[in-house]
């Protein structure tokens, strides 16, 4: 049942061609659907959500597929790119390939430790990148957000408030 739902979502994405956006944006926050099976971890196709904490209910993309996303960015744009330990190095490359200069890393401390192979993970990262000369409102924001995790992949409310204050 779960795999059928995932296949339906994949087909809907392909049919509706969600990459054909005709606007350009000055602020973009993106949380790519990383394919953890690439890094020896979890995959939306391989795991049953009732038996594995890491299962996801959405289709994932490879690093190569994510890198090919046509980002609808204006000439002057701020990018917030969410990533995890497994894809941190790839994320720097993707940010650059999308035309953004790396500026900082925001760390989300989820308060309680999660899963991990070599070390129990408790944080997630958000790379801040600039394209051109975007307008930023002051520099009083901190590079760490401490807020408990919520539903899978849902980012902390403090992040959205920070983006609103900055941009």
Question: Whereabouts are the PLM-identified features?
Answer:
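Class I S-adenosyl-L-methionine-dependent methyltransferase catalytic core
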Residues: 1-167
């Amino acid at each position: 049942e779960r795999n059928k739902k995932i296949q339906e979502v994949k087909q809907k994405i392909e049919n509706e061609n969600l990459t054909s956006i005709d606007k350009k944006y000055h602020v973009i926050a993106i949380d790519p659907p990383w394919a953890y099976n690439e890094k020896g971890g979890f995959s939306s196709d391989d795991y049953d959500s009732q038996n594995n904490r890491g299962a996801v209910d959405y289709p994932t993309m490879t690093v190569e597929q994510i890198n090919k996303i046509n980002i609808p960015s204006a000439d002057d744009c701020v990018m917030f790119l969410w990533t995890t330990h497994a894809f941190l190095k790839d994320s720097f490359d993707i940010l650059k390939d999308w035309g953004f200069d790396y500026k900082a890393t925001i760390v989300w401390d989820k308060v309680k430790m999660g899963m991990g192979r070599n070390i129990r993970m408790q944080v997630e990262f958000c790379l801040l990148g600039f394209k051109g000369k975007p307008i930023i409102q002051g520099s009083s924001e901190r590079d760490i957000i401490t807020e408990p995790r919520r539903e899978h992949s849902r980012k902390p409310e403090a992040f959205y408030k920070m983006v609103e204050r900055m941009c």
